[in-house]
């Protein structure tokens, strides 16, 4: 608890710098000061989805039963929905600023993603990453229906991967192209992360110890 606030701030900063150093640097001539926030929004959206999926998985294994209720999943759904909207807002803000500035070294990013078949991929990203989850998660009932909510969490993981593909692939390929490595690379990294996560999870208490606010958090009723 002592380091949670500091860790959150450091996580936001390192996430933004990772976006600049790993993704934006693929095209050395293109730059966007808002790109770090764009990456941050997508990352925190996925944190909410993974948190919900892990909680569902643990409850299926007989753990956390009676502790995590549908009200908690509804709150995670609110955060997931909020970051879906925030991601779209930041994405549109970046596009609007580049369109308004109309500088060749900036517009090249979107020009590459509107030519040679990439325009279709851009439309799929807009519809699949924003419009569909916005409609699916806007209602209260959708966040309390665990089958639908779990499906949407998995769906957003896939769309987040597609967002990465949309950022990286046009720099490497003039025309739309997909390799088996685009999928297996993600699966490999996901496997390493899952193994490390489960290793840490097995050695720590699932429920915070001696937390004076724990009872209030577990017994609240959502609206």
Give the predicted meaning of each segment.
Residues 120-146:
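Extended C-terminal subregions enriched in glycine
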Residues 41-56, 128-133, 185-201:
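Hydrophobic cores of alpha-helical transmembrane segments in multi-pass inner/ER membrane proteins
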Residues 1-123:
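Long, contiguous internal "core" modules enriched in hydrophobic/ aromatic residues
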Residues 26-31, 142-146, 167-181:
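Extracellular/periplasmic helix-loop-helix junctions in multi-pass membrane proteins
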Residues 147-158:
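Central hydrophobic cores of alpha-helical transmembrane segments
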Residues 89, 133, 164, 205:
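Hydrophobic, well-ordered secondary-structure elements that form the walls
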Residues 63, 67-71, 189-223:
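Extramembrane terminal tails and long inter-domain/linker segments of multi-pass membrane proteins
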Residues 108-124, 171-188, 212-223:
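Membrane-interface segments at transmembrane helix junctions and kinks
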